[in-house]
């Protein structure tokens, strides 16, 4: 499996199809953004596109062929090409969505690896069912930039509750991004792990860390 990051909360996951689907490749794109945020949007060529919430920096499906691409934009259970997706309702803020609306957490299973993308999670704590619905996670994609989401301290607390094998921070300030949020440094320091820096992250079930959590930071 290969994970690529386009900036902000946008990732592409490329994996082998599930055994029941065939022997080809499957591709999942999460939270494609508008060029208005200052970054170059990815071209959509994927089997599935997941939208965590309906804001311009997460919901740009322009150019997607809806005949071949499954667009998922809310809670529920989905499957295509042996990639299994579960959407879990959450809130974009600490006031039950009254400030910024709803957010969908996605749990994706492919190649026997479980990836959780938290979207613009803004709650200060999980509701009772949410942690159970998320379940065991191998790779956690977690917002850390604050202001519109949880901040770096809250992100560390959320990570400690989910207990993933790998953490990939997202939704933080990078060059050219026009959104005013924090960079990743405070989160990295608070977490206390030295990041493995990558251009693309290649991972297999057999290579997942067993004892210690790993922090992966995209260049």
List PLM regions with ranges.
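Active-site metal-binding motif and surrounding structural segment of the metallo-beta-lactamase
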Residues: 34-77, 132-141
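Active-site metal-binding loops of divalent metal-dependent hydrolases
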Residues: 32-34, 54, 90-92, 119-123, ...
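Active-site-proximal loop/helix segments of hydrolase catalytic cores
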Residues: 94-162
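Active-site-proximal beta-strand elements of phosphoester/diester hydrolases
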Residues: 2-5, 27-31, 84-91, 105-107, ...
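Short Gly/Ser/Thr- and charged-rich N-terminal loops/segments
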Residues: 18-25
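Portal/gating segments that form or line small-molecule/metal binding sites
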Residues: 63-116
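Divalent metal-coordination and catalytic microenvironments
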Residues: 13, 49, 53, 85, ...
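Binuclear metal-ion centers of metallo-dependent hydrolases, dominated by the metallo-beta-lactamase
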Residues: 3-6, 99-100, 166-219
